[in-house]
Structures are given as structure tokens and as C-alpha cells.
From Swiss-Prot:
It comes from Serpula lacrymans var. lacrymans (strain S7.9). Induction: Up-regulated upon coincubation of the fungus with the terrestrial bacteria Streptomyces iranensis, Bacillus subtilis or Pseudomonas putida. Residues 55-469 are annotated as: Adenylation (A) domain. Residues 606-676 are annotated as: Thiolation and peptide carrier (T) domain. SMART domains: PKS_PP (SM00823), PKS_TE (SM00824). An L-tyrosine:2-oxoglutarate aminotransferase (probably amt1) and atromentin synthetase nps3 catalyze consecutive steps to turn over L-tyrosine into atromentin, which represents the generic precursor molecule for the entire terphenylquinone and pulvinic acid family of pigments, which are widely distributed secondary metabolites in homobasidiomycetes. The first step catalyzed by the aminotransferase converts L-tyrosine in to 4-hydroxyphenylpyruvate (4-HPP). The modification O-(pantetheine 4'-phosphoryl)serine is found at residue 638. One of its GO terms (biological process) is biosynthetic process. This is Atromentin synthetase nps3. Residues 601-679 form the Carrier domain. Transmembrane segments: none annotated. One of its GO terms (molecular function) is transferase activity. Residues 702-805 are annotated as: Thioesterase (TE) domain.
Length: 962
């Protein structure tokens, strides 16, 4: 007989009982507890005046920490609040806070609260103009007002929408300098059930909803969480989640503020660009509690597992708890992570911490269910870590998802529902959504499918239409809308469903569709291959991930509901149960047939050897590799190029296979021919050709990219793959890398060479060209040259480069050029490059290179296959390009220009845009488009930023009709 179904209340967690008692003793009696956020801030400043808030901003290249004491911060935000009241807005007015840095967001939110306003935290706006403007208008209509507090860059993004009342945070700070209010000043006295902070949902299934959290819901959540964590004034907390997320603001700021803990808030770019900094900060600041989602656990485990030279390098004895959320945590990954951290520790015996997977939502003030376990002694029972038991005051239950009421027995899956004082009050100005989110008893319907066994919860799926990739939620309906447009897909007979294969680190998805053609007709194999290729390409471009499986199902076997919809849940169930195996087998048969039509069996010894290398890189069978395969079309990245180079050198006993030759010979048989010639010494000096074809598929206008000031093109490899089956992607490489090649001595010579090569490659226009950094002015000059010859240039992309560069070129001496190159290559940090310059200048050239060489990470030198001699020569190439730019004075104009801007090397982004980049307007016959892109000058195309950059860049190509 099945046990009686019950809801699950709070269950005490034995491993935190002692810390809980300490926390409660520190906080005092219940009568001392603050009832509003105003009281909470006052209490923190009074009880812990010297405790610190630390911040590492996005522009802190050296990861330097700026600090404010609780007392100083309290005074700062109250002065800001007093300045805010000068806006003369009614009490209860909503202010959309749209800022980048933790410190600014934090101060703005508290200032709004103390001024009697309601802050609404706005995450990063979409790069798609129509989607961004649609969202801003939606927010304006939802709040019946449109007051935004932002910075200069945010104002640029928002001002395209009419009727927005924009205030700059810099102006507010300036105004606040004129006030010095009492330490307990507030414009209004808040009540526990007043609206406190609004958080926007992801909008993954439509426009965002605004989640209303009151003072009561926030404080209830923070108390329960702090007690669960065992927080005290001796605890050190590390946060890198954005402040616009409930985890960043409520869980990792207000919660430790309540308990008087030290807080270090780090901009996400610092951790994501260098995951090792996560461990350095734990070591340097004796961090006790930190957050690491599954993808970061996986990345750290994968990157550091083989880094034996780092073993024993970090003091990790302080860390006691690593929270993880946002996506399911793979048990195996978490175990490896713990093992690796112990190996990296100076004294592994002193490292003892729990990894706590958790469940939470915007609607629950972030985490409300946790399962802290010591993975060094406990082996998880399931593929993913359990999510555990509720915090104090929270209840959970599993019910029938159809009626939302009928309880499911212990161990049986169903819809997860939660309730408690930390659950949100309502959706702002949306009673219908609020009503549909709750059932009788104020149980909140999470939309997740879970199982509770012996009081411990784990998730098994989701009702909601989203797929999570590395913690980022993407809307399935939006993806389906674009996939429906693919030729070969029957309209309204396509569905995509989130799916995580056994052992997979992150979530993926499966596409089900009915083809417009009969799978038994004569040309079905080629049609199917083309359809699947298009479905993969669109998926990668929209959500950075291809489908795990694409399943064609005849239309007469694709059942719809009575409302005419496909059931994703039903299709996914059929897939998991093997009911679609015959359709998968038929598709595989046809795709193999299509591939067989173009399959070329590797014939020579060299081709066979490369087939083995290709197979190893892409985890394929050697029999599946064709001599006609293109390395990049198989999915090769810039890192894969390095691996191919190394393995090729080992197999063929060659001292070096130049990377450029791999880029120029990406097809297996062509690369084999080149190697045969190299081995036989029959590799005669080839005439310099600046064009490097990085991808050749697609029928749209080709795009040509000009190298940055280092002269190389490897940085474009990861970008080029996003253009597969859309348009060819060519890159220009500077002269001088190959033996015997002279450097360019004049810019005009370079422009003439590139323009001629462009015409040879694409004899007729219209043309599209872009240049990154220094390459931007070259692209501008090449476009002018083409237009002067009567050709149409429909796109000129100028990426983070001003028109006037001569002064900057004259500033760069040999030492500066060498350090710039070293920073660009990841050999030294930006701070090291700046600090070393005066020290190195008196030294000889060789001595300077020796210093940089010793500072360079050994693994990076191996990855780049650098030697001191190669680095020295590369510095000369970069120096020759600098010399070409010293006399450059822009003149003339092009028909159109698109300027892309990121965080500059020096100064603020707004100054960079307004004073350095806006002058491009004088060199375009139509007003240029200025487009903000994520990242810094040297990182905007790196692995972390290229998925967003390609979307933005391709949208501008589309806008220009290219």
C-alpha cells in the first residue's frame, strides 16, 4: 500500500544546528528583528559599522577591490535617497534601475527604497532593436510610468523609445554630494506589506512579468536562508551573480547584510573570463560561502583536473559551502570538482565543505530548498544532485499537474508546488497571471516536475517552455518560430523540447517535425540533409547550441491536441521510451546516404592519419571521416586548431605546422597534400595571399574581416562558424608571418593588396567588409578604394576603433607594442602590461622579452606554440603595422558605416563612444549606426562573448540588406 501523500514542511538540517544557534544568539530575541528593509539597513549600520562591502567592477583589469564599510554605505545611500526626493515623484513611484556594476545597483536600490520609491531591477536589454523596444514599451505600459535610473550607455539604449523619463546615476551621485542627512533618515516609514522591490522574470515565454516582493517576503526569506547557511558577522561571502537577479541582490547581499557578514561582489566577467580567479578570491579573502552554477563547476573541474602544477597552490581551508543553482547539478561533475579542489589546496586535510544544490525562483526570493552534502564522503544516489529540504517556513509538495491539487504519493513524480512567507505577493498589474499561479491554500505552481522521497526533493523536468543552456534560459516558442521557417518543415508541425541526455553536463533539446517531402522519394536523402543542416544552423545562431537530436516524423503520425497543438511532453515521452526509434533509424539511413554521395574514403597514408586525428578531435569513428571533410564545418574551434596542429606535428615528425596553413587548408585532403609537400621538402615559397578562407558555405554576400593590430586571424575562427551555410567568411592576414615575406611599409600598400585580393576572391559586388580594432581603419580604406572603382559596398563594420589613430600609434614604442601584443595573446594581464612598461624600457630588447616570457603562463605558451624567437618576430610584425598607422589621417567617406563599441582600454564607455567613435559620422555619407556589444576591447570576440557578438553583428548585416 502506498504511503499517504503529504506536503513536506521544514526539516532541520543537522549539519547547521550549531551554526544556527550561534546566528540566533548573535541576532538576539525575535523582538529585535527588523520588520522592514529600512530597519534592516539601520540595524546593520549600527551593529556592524566597520564590516565591509567589497566590489570588483567590470573595468577592474587587475581585480582590485574597492570597499565601503556598512556605516559609510548607509550614509552614502541615504544622501542619494535625499537627492532622489528632489525628483518630486509621488511616494510609491516605480523607478527602473538599469546599471551595470554591483555597487551602483546596490546603492540605487537602497536609495529608491529610502526615498519612498519602488525599485525595479532591469537585466541587460536585448541586442535586437525590435525586441528591446518592445520590452521597454511593455514595461512603460505595465507600470503606467517610465522613469529609468541608468548610466550613459543605458540611456543610449533606452532613448530610442518615446516617453521615457531618463535620469543618470552619475547626476544623482553629484547631487547627493550636497547632502549630509542623519544616519537614520528616510523620506517615508515603510510597512512590512508595502511593495519593496520588483524583479522582472526572464520573459522566456513572452514579455516579462514584474514579481512583487514586499518587505515581509524578503526579510522572511533572508532570515531563513541566513540561519540555514549559519551566517554570522565572522562569515565571508563571495557573490558574482548580477544584482538584477534575486540571488545576487537578496540571497547574496541583503541576507549577509542582515547577519553582519563580509560581502565581496565581483562582476561576472571577472569570473567567466578567468574561472581560476574564483579560487584566488576564496584564498585571498578567506571566503566561507560562494555560488557556482553547474557550468562553472564543470569548467573548473575540466580545466583544472590536469593542472598538476597548480596542486597545493591555494589555501582553501576557509570555504565551507558552495551553493549551486540555475540548472541541474551533475553529480559526477560535482564529485570531480570537490576532488580537484582538494588537490589544489595547500593542505587537503583542512578542506571540508559542502556543495549545496538548490531550488529557487524569482518568485521565491531565490533559493528556498537546499541539500548541502559533503561529496568527499557521500556518493550521490542519482545522476543529478538532489535539491533537498525546504528552509524554515517553506513547505513543498508534489501534485497532479493536470488539476494542480491532487497530492502524489512519496516517490511519484508530479508538479512541484511551494508555499511560505518568502513566496512573492503578486505579479504587478497582472491579476490574471497571479491568479493562475496559485491554487487553494496559496500554493505556488512552480511549473517544474519533481519527486519527493523521504522528505528530499529532486526535479525531473519542467512544464514551462524553456531550455537552459549554461544557466541561461531561452524560450522554446521563439526558437520554434524561426525553425518553422526552414524549407522542408511542414508549417505548424514542429516542436522543440528541452532534454538532458544521461551524463550530459548541461541541458539540450530535441526537435520533432514533419517534413514537407516523402522520406521514401528519390531525392529524400539530400532534402533531409539540407533541412537538418538549416535546423542546426538556426539553433546555434539563436541559442548557441545545436539540437541533440532532430527527428522527422511523417505528418500522418504526428498527433495534435484538440486545440491543434503538438504536445512537447508527449513527443519527449515517446522519444525517451524508444517509440520513435524507427523514425530516428530512417533519418540516420537517409543522412548516411546523403553523406555517402559526397563521401571520399581517405586514400593516402597522410589522409588516413589525419582522419584519425579528426576523429579524435570530434569524438567520431575514423570510418565516419571523409577526405572531403572541412575541419571547421565539423565544428572545429580555435582551440581545436591548436590540438590539430600539435597532433599533426607529432604524427608526422614535423617541427612545426603553421596555423595559417591549417586555416588555409581546412579540407582534410588539401591539408594532407600540404603536409606531403612539407615532408618531401617540396614546399616552395608561395606568393603572399592575404585572404584566409575560414568558412566557404552559404549563398549570401561574403563577409571579409580585417585583422587587428597583431596581424593574425585566429581570433576570427570561433566567429566564422556562426556563418556556416549563410555566407562565406574570409579574413585578411598581415604580410610577414612566413619566412622571406617583407612587412608592409605603407598603409596604402596594405590597402592596395587587400582590395586586389578581395576583388580576386569576389569579382563583383555588393561587398561587405569589417575590421576589428586597427583593422577597422583598413576596412574603411579598402571600402573607399572599392567604391572609387565603381563597386557598391553595402556594409562597412568598424569594431571598437576611432577614425583618428595616428596619435595613439605615435604613443606606442617598441616596449608598448610588445606589451600590447602580450596582453592580447593572454601572456600578461592589462595591469601587468601597464606596470611593466617603465621598468622594461631601460632594458635591452632581449631582456624585455625574457621578463615577459617568464611571466607568461606555460600552458598559454604551449597552446599558442610560441617560442621566444616567434614572439620576437611577431612583435616586429605588429610594429610594422603601427608604423603604417603613424601617418594615417582619415579622409573621404563611405556610403554606410556600422560602428560597434565595447569597453575601451582606457576611460569610460560613454566618453569612448561620444568623443572618440562618434566622429565616424564625418566619414560616412549616411548617419552611422552605433551598436553596443558585450565585453572589453580585447575580449569582445573571445569564447564567452562571441555568441552574443555574432547575433548583434549578423543583425546589423541583415539591417543593411546584406
Amino acid at each position: 500500500m502506498a504511503p499517504a501523500p503529504t506536503s513536506v514542511p521544514l526539516v532541520s538540517q543537522p549539519n547547521v544546528i550549531s551554526d544556527l544557534k550561534t546566528a540566533l544568539a548573535v541576532q538576539g530575541s525575535a523582538s529585535d528583528h527588523p520588520r522592514t528593509l529600512h530597519q534592516l539597513l539601520s540595524q546593520a549600520a549600527e551593529r556592524y559599522p566597520l564590516q565591509q562591502l567589497g566590489f570588483i567592477s567590470s573595468s577592474a583589469h587587475d581585480s582590485s577591490i574597492q570597499t565601503k564599510s556598512y556605516s559609510t554605505f548607509n550614509q552614502h545611500v541615504r544622501n542619494l535617497a535625499r537627492a532622489l526626493t528632489d525628483w518630486k515623484k509621488p511616494v510609491g513611484s516605480i523607478v527602473v534601475v538599469y546599471l551595470t556594476e554591483h555597487e551602483d545597483n546596490m546603492a540605487a536600490v537602497w536609495a529608491c527604497l529610502l526615498a519612498g520609491y519602488i525599485p525595479c531591477l532591469q537585466p541587460a536589454l536585448s541586442a535586437q532593436q525590435s525586441h528591446k523596444e518592445g520590452h521597454i514599451n511593455h514595461i512603460k505600459n505595465l507600470f503606467l510610468s517610465a522613469t529609468w535610473l541608468t548610466n550613459e550607455i543605458g540611456a543610449e539604449q533606452v532613448m530610442s523609445v518615446d516617453g521615457i523619463d531618463i535620469h543618470l546615476f552619475s547626476d544623482l551621485k553629484l547631487a547627493a554630494e550636497g547632502y549630509n542627512v542623519p544616519a537614520d533618515w528616510a523620506a517615508v516609514e515603510a510597512k512590512p506589506d508595502d511593495e519593496a522591490i520588483l524583479f522582472l522574470t526572464s520573459g522566456s515565454t513572452g514579455f516579462s512579468k514584474a514579481v512583487v516582493h514586499t518587505h515581509r517576503t524578503i526579510i522572511a526569506s533572508c532570515y531563513a536562508k541566513g540561519q540555514s547557511y549559519g551566517l554570522t558577522s565572522e562569515t565571508n561571502v563571495l557573490n558574482w551573480v548580477g544584482f538584477d537577479h534575486v540571488a545576487g541582490s537578496l540571497e547574496m547581499h541583503i541576507t549577509p547584510l542582515l547577519f553582519g557578514s563580509y560581502q565581496l561582489h565581483v562582476h561576472a566577467s571577472t569570473i567567466l573570463s578567468d574561472p581560476l580567479s574564483f579560487l584566488r578570491l576564496i584564498d585571498d579573502k578567506s571566503i566561507n560561502i560562494a555560488f557556482a552554477p553547474n557550468f562553472l563547476l564543470a569548467k573548473l573541474a575540466r580545466d583544472l583536473e590536469k593542472r598538476s602544477e597548480l596542486y597545493g597552490a591555494f589555501d582553501l581551508s576557509s570555504v565551507k559551502r558552495i551553493n549551486s543553482g540555475g540548472e541541474a547539478v551533475v553529480s559526477k561533475t560535482a564529485k570531480i570538482f570537490v576532488t580537484v579542489l582538494k588537490a589544489l589546496a595547500k593542505d587537503p586535510s583542512k578542506v571540508s565543505f559542502v556543495v549545496s544544490a538548490g531550488f529557487g525562483m524569482t518568485e521565491t526570493c531565490a533559493g528556498c530548498i537546499y541539500d548541502p552534502i559533503d561529496l568527499s564522503v557521500i556518493n550521490p544516489m542519482h545522476e543529478f544532485l538532489d535539491l533537498g529540504r525546504p528552509i524554515q517556513g517553506c513547505e513543498m509538495r508534489i501534485v497532479d499537474p493536470e488539476d494542480g491539487i491532487t497530492l502524489r504519493p512519496d516517490g511519484e513524480s508530479g508538479e512541484l508546488q511551494v508555499r511560505g512567507p518568502m513566496v512573492f505577493a503578486r505579479y504587478y498589474n497582472n491579476p490574471q497571471a497571479t491568479s493562475s499561479s496559485f491554487v487553494e491554500g496559496r500554493w505556488y505552481r512552480t511549473g517544474d516536475i519533481g519527486i519527493i522521497e523521504k522528505g528530499v526533493m529532486r526535479l525531473s523536468g519542467r512544464i514551462k517552455d524553456t531550455v537552459i543552456v549554461h544557466g541561461v534560459s531561452y524560450g522554446i516558442p521563439e526558437l520554434e518560430t524561426y525553425l518553422q521557417l526552414v524549407e522542408g518543415v511542414t508549417h505548424s508541425f514542429l516542436a522543440a523540447a528541452p532534454y538532458r541526455a544521461p551524463g550530459q553536463e548541461t541541458e539540450g533539446f530535441v526537435v520533432f517535425y514533419s517534413p514537407t517531402f516523402d522520406l521514401n522519394e528519390e531525392d529524400a536523402s539530400n532534402k533531409l540533409a539540407a533541412t537538418h543542416r538549416a535546423l542546426r544552423d538556426i539553433s546555434v545562431k539563436m541559442i548557441t547550441l545545436p539540437p541533440q537530436q532532430i527527428i522527422p516524423i511523417p505528418i500522418d503520425q504526428m498527433e495534435k491536441t484538440t486545440l491543434g497543438k503538438l504536445s512537447r511532453a508527449r513527443l519527449l515521452t515517446l522519444f525517451k521510451q524508444g517509440e520513435l526509434a524507427k523514425h530516428i533509424a530512417r533519418a540516420d539511413e537517409l543522412l548516411s546516404e546523403a553523406r555517402g554521395a559526397t563521401f571520399v574514403v581517405p586514400a593516402t597514408i597522410t589522409e588516413t592519419a589525419f582522419a584519425k586525428i579528426f576523429a579524435g578531435v570530434f569524438n567520431l569513428s575514423t570510418d565516419d571521416i571523409s577526405a572531403a571533410d572541412n575541419f571547421f564545418e565539423l565544428g572545429g574551434t580555435s582551440i581545436d586548431v591548436i590540438r590539430l596542429k600539435r597532433e599533426g606535428e607529432t604524427v608526422f615528425g614535423l617541427p612545426e605546422i603553421p596555423i595559417i596553413q591549417i586555416l588555409k587548408h581546412p579540407v582534410l585532403r588539401d591539408l594532407a597534400k600540404y603536409i606531403d609537400a612539407l615532408v618531401s621538402k617540396d614546399n616552395t615559397q608561395q606568393e603572399y595571399d592575404p585572404i584566409v578562407p575560414l568558412q566557404l558555405t552559404g549563398n549570401k554576400t561574403p563577409i571579409f574581416f580585417v585583422h587587428p593590430g597583431v596581424g593574425e586571424v585566429l581570433i576570427f575562427v570561433n566567429l566564422a562558424k556562426y556563418f556556416q551555410n549563410e555566407r562565406p567568411f574570409y579574413a585578411f592576414r598581415a604580410r610577414g608571418f612566413e619566412p622571406g615575406q617583407p612587412f608592409f611599409s605603407k598603409m596604402d600598400e596594405m590597402v592596395s593588396s587587400y582590395a586586389a585580393a578581395m576583388k580576386r576572391t569576389q569579382p563583383k559586388g555588393p561587398y561587405a567588409i569589417a575590421g576589428y580594432s586597427y583593422g577597422g581603419v583598413i576596412a574603411f580604406e579598402v571600402a573607399k578604394r572599392l567604391e572609387a572603382g565603381g563597386d557598391e559596398v553595402k556594409f562597412v563594420g568598424l569594431i571598437n576603433i576611432p577614425p583618428h589613430i595616428a596619435d595613439r600609434m605615435h604613443e606606442i614604442d617598441w616596449t608598448g607594442g610588445m606589451l600590447n601584443l602580450s596582453y592580447f595573446l593572454g601572456l600578461v594581464s592589462k595591469q601587468d602590461a601597464d606596470d611593466l612598461a617603465p621598468t622594461l624600457r631601460p632594458l635591452t630588447r632581449k631582456e624585455q622579452l625574457d621578463v615577459v616570457w617568464k611571466l607568461s603562463p606555460p600552458e598559454r605558451l604551449v597552446e599558442l606554440q610560441l617560442t621566444p624567437e616567434k614572439l620576437d618576430h611577431w612583435v616586429d610584425i605588429a610594429g610594422s603595422l603601427i608604423e603604417c598607422g603613424k601617418d594615417y589621417n582619415p579622409s573621404g567617406s563611405v556610403a554606410v558605416a556600422d560602428v560597434f563599441y565595447a569597453i575601451p582600454l582606457r576611460g569610460s564607455k560613454s566618453d569612448w563612444l561620444n568623443n572618440q567613435l562618434k566622429p565616424w559620422s564625418g566619414f560616412s555619407r549616411t548617419e552611422p549606426a552605433f551598436t553596443d556589444v558585450p565585453g572589453r576591447h580585447y575580449t569582445l570576440m573571445d569564447f564567452d562573448h562571441v555568441p552574443q557578438f555574432q547575433k548583434i553583428f549578423r543583425s546589423r548585416l541583415e539591417a543593411r540588406g546584406v
